[in-house]
Amino acid sequence: MKKLFFLLITLYVFTACQSKYNDVPDTYHTLLDSALIKANSNAPQILKALTDAPKNQKEGMAFLISYMPKRDLTTLSASFLLENAAYAYKTREKYPWSKALPDSIFFNEVLPYTNVAETRDPWRKDFYERFSKYVEDKTNLKDAIFAIANPIKDEVKVEYNVKRSKVDSSPKEAMAENMATCTGLSIILTDAFRSVGIPSRLAGTPMWTNMKGNHTWSEVFIDNEWKFIEYYPEDLNKSWFLADAGKADPNNPLHWIYAVSYKPTNQYYYAGRAVKHLINKMDVNDMPAQMRKGYENSKKHDSISEGPYIYGVNVTQRYIDLYEKSLKGKKLEEDELIASFIIFKDKDIAKSDSRLDCRVDIFMEDEKIDFGYSPSATDDMNKFLKLKLKKNTNYTVMVSNTKNNIEHSFSISTDDNATQEFKLIL
């Protein structure tokens, strides 16, 4: 009986779709066939969404359906999808920043109804009605971004609170409780941006390199690049966590910075999969004290449970570059300097292959002052790890690389200049 039902569904999809793909680019046809088979008994609803979508919305609807997680293919109604698309396209017609977007950005970072694993609430219409009034007189995208971000907590009446019932709460769930963690707050902020045609996505890390837990925030696409912003905003690309993000380890997925993609990529968004894969294999009792504390903090405060269908992009290097740029722009105190570090495995320091990517910890007597990661053999030869230190001071530098079984210490002394380079040879 099951086999017969599957064959009937397959036949239904095949015959129905032949006349329904007329306004959809050929590149989606095979993907749509596959999606409708996965939808099983919900295939008529999914097909109705595609069929009833206005001609100018067909490709966007095809994009959503083609890359839709199975959990949504089997449950979402045509009315849910049609309303979501209608309001997304309404913003594209209304706002200059949305009208100017390439399809690839509009489809992937404005049109989607979801971010990670939150409940699929129909938030789009409600949020458009809530937030469109804030951008009515805006013609500049940055002004529009902050016209949403500045009043958002007062509009939705949601504050950060770890007592929330869920980590990845939907806007409706967070607003019912008046609380959310950073994941829930970021979902609200990203959905608010999308509701007025501003491309936005979630970003975050499974675990900071200082092992103090994880974090999630939002990104917006402005001036043809992605910039980060928080629910409690300071400015674009400015927040308390930049120093932590800038010290991410580009060689360890546990410490990468990830951004969410609706369209499948070649890797998953962190959403706990990196945490589970790289940490949960360990016995918690065997973890170093700092890692164990960070792991427990991560479980308490943010998500380590989202599903395997959430895709991501590795944006680690962009955050490292942003942090290094911020250091250059900082005014140094009279007794401070910027120290640049690079680690070599041999004395041939002119060769790119001699460089080693290592963790570099700086100590003054027994107190750890700072840390970071030195450039690898494939990085630009002008790239250094930059740290702010005191002038005319003695330090101990601990260099480690577990993959290559390296652990070495150096004694260094800073001088009286504003900058100083340290090329350390193992």
Model segments located where?
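Sec-dependent signal peptide recognition
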Residues: K2-L7
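C-terminal motif of bacterial Sec signal peptides marking the signal peptidase cleavage site
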Residues: V13-A16
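Bacterial signal peptide processing site
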Residues: Q18-K20
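Secondary-structure boundary elements
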Residues: Q45-K48, A53-N178, T265-N266, A271-G272, ...
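Cysteine-centered nucleophilic/redox motifs
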Residues: I148, N178-A203, S218
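His-Asp-centered catalytic microenvironments across diverse enzyme cores
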Residues: N161-V162, S195, A203-T216, V220-M381, ...
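A short, solvent-exposed beta-strand micro-motif common in secreted/extracellular proteins
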Residues: K391-K403
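Structured interaction patches on ligand/partner-binding surfaces of diverse proteins
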Residues: T402-L426
